[in-house]
Amino acid sequence: MSAIAVIDFGSQFTQLIARQIREMGVYCEIFPSNIDFETVSKFNGFIFSGGPQSVNDNCSEVSEVAHKIIKLNETINTPILGICYGQQLICHYFGAKVRKEFNQEFGKTKIKILKESPIIKDTWDVNSEVDVLMNHADSVETIPQGFTAIASGIINQTIAIIANEQRKIYCTQFHPEVKPTTNGSKLLSNFLDIANCERDWTMKSFIEKQKEKIQNLVGEKKVIAAVSGGVDSSVAAVLTHKAIGKQLNCIFIDTGLLRKSQTTAMLKEIPINYVDKSNLFLSRLKGITDPEEKRKIIGNTFIEVFEEEAKKIGDVDFLMQGTIYSDVVESGHASGNTSTIKSHHNVGGLPEKMNLKLVEPLRYLFKDEVRLLGKEIGLSDEIIFQHPFPGPGLAVRIICEVDEEKVRILQEVDEIYINTMKNYDLYDKIWQAFAVLLPVKTVGVMGDNRTYGYVCALRAVTSSDGMTADAFPFENKDQHSLVFWRFLQDISSIIVNKVSRVNRVVYDLTSKPPATIEWE
């Protein structure tokens, strides 16, 4: 099977490269810039991502693998594509001068195509002007020996595309993977053709490969699975069960932080043990308000409970989790140069001294790919298309100390919000919707009486992979917008009338970035 390795130097767009290449039918994997060369040496081609560094700084640590890949290209002609910082790194390697750009370029700009090349075949014509996204502080000042200019910036004469056709090395100063770049995905597709990649990666092939990986990793050992009833853990559990059958022991832990009607009953083909540890989780969260501390406490307690259950089963060596790629990215584990946005209870929140080894079959899949996988293995739409629910549960939707009363209030609000949304035929139009209980109370009037109750915030976003998101319905100006505004008016009235401790409802309009989807 053909495969492309993306060496991640910390760009915010790296995941978009991988997603687009996978959508073209070629398997693509992202590796940190300090990855061991032997791990990536057998790939059909390499892409060096953008990043915040400057090649004029000491970049020997982050560029060691890049230098070895360029040496590999010298030997066996493995194609390389450098994007933004990746272009600067390659040019610096070949002795070109990279300067600090006085007119730094951030945002949409135009380039002019100077010459034909396989990298822009059927993409842009010579002499045409093309919209692209630039995002750089440094620029390549001189073209390295053996390379040819394919395109240049119209405003700043930036060296926008260069190519060494003989060695199959291509560089762009702009980001072809981002939408403001016109037809940028075609450039990526051309690179796959240059690398002689077969378009044979599908969910079916992924399933077979993952089953084989799980079997080789686990052997004859037993595995316990963290099943929450959500799409990620459900898909991961069914896939693992298909790989090792009865060696998998699925456990549902009631943390006391779940939705009111959350259940795993839909997974008919897998036996599930129910464990109620709600009192334990709530007691450990007493007095805790910091969101990172909440996540780590929940992560530690979660694993502790699983270790206890593993002892009851006996001879268990592995813990399966439904970790997906957005969890890894936001926890800062995808690249040595990426900062931590938040710890996820099934990634950064794990105790360092775990007594169980991890099985994470979905670790490098995006949410939309997880849903495609769920379809392929026969899960119902009810499971596959349910909205994401965070591993720490309602603890990160209660923006203050967590206790049983606040959980009950938020469960009631959440149930009303989601069920009413379904009645309005809006649920399937929205990527994720949920309610948040705020740490403030406000004055209200009901009947002739003064009230002093909690404020709850409602959130609804559209997204494709969870990496970016827009507040619904502002991304799409259609008939759903009018329906949604009527829905918000109705739902606020229903909530304050049915949930006695809440007297005010607000709606969160913030996109991601700058915010995250969840509040904590």
UniProtKB/Swiss-Prot annotation:
Its EC number is 6.3.5.2. Residues 3-200 form the Glutamine amidotransferase type-1 domain. The active site is at C84 (nucleophile), H175, E177. Pathway: Purine metabolism; GMP biosynthesis; GMP from XMP (L-Gln route): step 1/1. InterPro entries: Class_I_gatase-like (IPR029062), GATASE (IPR017926), GMP_synth_C (IPR001674), GMP_synth_GATase (IPR004739), GMP_synthase (IPR022955), GMPS_ATP_PPase_dom (IPR025777), NAD/GMP_synthase (IPR022310), Rossmann-like_a/b/a_fold (IPR014729). Catalyzes the synthesis of GMP from XMP. Homodimer. This is GMP synthase [glutamine-hydrolyzing]. It comes from Wolbachia pipientis subsp. Culex pipiens (strain wPip).
